[in-house]
Amino acid sequence: MAGDTEVWKQMFQELMREVKPWHRWTLRPDKGLLPNVLKPGWMQYQQWTFARFQCSSCSRNWASAQVLVLFHMNWSEEKSRGQVKMRVFTQRCKKCPQPLFEDPEFTQENISRILKNLVFRILKKCYRGRFQLIEEVPMIKDISLEGPHNSDNCEACLQGFCAGPIQVTSLPPSQTPRVHSIYKVEEVVKPWASGENVYSYACQNHICRNLSIFCCCVILIVIVVIVVKTAI
């Protein structure tokens, strides 16, 4: 995540404040994070995404639709505090003799989608939100990719963590996201209608719960009144 860590942290906290304003959530990178290796009380969420890379030795550029982004989440109800650890797996140049593993670069749009997906998963797993999970939205790619995934130069593949290819969506040229984005993750998100606030599901769930409580109170009052009148 390099120098973009603060961007991820800020965007994540803003999204969490929209749905859980009284709870404190933090996000931090952890290069030692491994899939399916969880501490007690922790949960996992993985996304395979589209991103760009640049070799620090020869300046060669390439793109991949199979970049693994790993999240581990933990929620303490007693402290009203949650934490997320994040790892973005790297790739290396296939042309250089001794290449370094490079961090991926992501568009702002895909960063936002990744984090929205993450928040949905937190609501589902940590708060047991009673909304229906929809399918994750394919990541946006700004170029066409040809050929198989280069597993020999993929950090996740070399460590045995890579999965099959993911579905990505190409944008028309007029809607192509900026290539030089601030961050570096991409994911699979859930499809929500254009202009619809992704967190309206959580808000609707909260309203329905409050309405149910109100109805129960009204019914209880009516029963008490009837009992009192009958007794008189």
Curated annotation (Swiss-Prot):
Expression by tissue: Expressed predominantly in adult liver. Expressed in testis. Also expressed in kidney, lung and fetal liver. Low levels in heart, thyroid, adrenal gland, pancreas, ovary, prostate, skin, plasma leukocytes, bone marrow and fetal brain. Not detected in brain, spleen, colon, small intestine, skeletal muscle, stomach, placenta, salivary gland and uterus.
Keyword Lipoprotein annotated: no
Subunit structure: Interacts with TAS2R16.
Bilayer-spanning residue ranges: 212-232
Gene Ontology molecular functions: olfactory receptor binding; zinc ion binding
Pfam families attached to this UniProt entry: Zn_ribbon_3CxxC (PF13695)
Cellular component GO terms, alphabetical: cytoplasm; membrane
GO BP field: detection of chemical stimulus involved in sensory perception of bitter taste; protein insertion into membrane; protein targeting to membrane
Keywords: Membrane, Metal-binding, Transmembrane, Transmembrane helix, Zinc, Zinc-finger
InterPro entries registered for this protein in UniProt: R-trans_p, ZAR1/RTP1-5-like_Znf-3CxxC
Membrane topology classification: Single-pass type III membrane protein
Primary localization: membrane
Zinc finger map (3CxxC-type): 49-160
Cytoplasmic side: 1-211
Gene: RTP3
Family affiliation: Belongs to the TMEM7 family.
Keyword Zinc-finger annotated: yes
Subcellular location as annotated: Membrane
Function per UniProt: Promotes functional cell surface expression of the bitter taste receptors TAS2R16 and TAS2R43.
Name of the protein in question: Receptor-transporting protein 3
